[in-house]
């Protein structure tokens, strides 16, 4: 596995991740935690990813603004990725939104992506089968792998190994990597999902 795995360490990310660890919290609190994590993980990504340009204004003063030569797309793996997107949209309000439906196809996205398209893929818990399908479709449409970032709350090392075999330069941002994927982890994931939609 040669993936670049970024386990976010921002204090607010650690705080909201801690909230998620307590399954006794009500669903509304857990949803708020996920929304906040979506925002702060996106912030960590955008720090190194946004392209800026210097613009001259009056009196020979220059300022830095986000370059309008690039377009940003948020790809949401439904239904749970939408919870992260609530926070991510706050930092990328002009980004186009594309949805991954139940058959893993991407809706509302151009068939002609290019090197000036930056794509953020959001899912609550990383699923390598769904993610592989999404990546294959994005690249088929012209996306550049180096312009794609994945954000999720948790992922398993076995899933990362499988993705790394095919997408060795892929970058993934998460709050936690589980070294062992077992029934207890699956139960925790289902508890969260059940509470979100209770």
UniProtKB/Swiss-Prot annotation:
Q: Cellular location of this protein?
A: Plastid, Chloroplast
Q: What is its main location?
A: plastid
GO CC, sorted alphabetically, is: chloroplast
Q: Which UniProt keywords apply?
A: Chloroplast, Plastid
Sorted alphabetically, which InterPro entries does this protein's record hold?
Answer: PRibTrfase_dom, PRTase-like
The record's family statement is: Belongs to the UPRTase family.
Q: What is this protein called?
A: Uracil phosphoribosyltransferase homolog
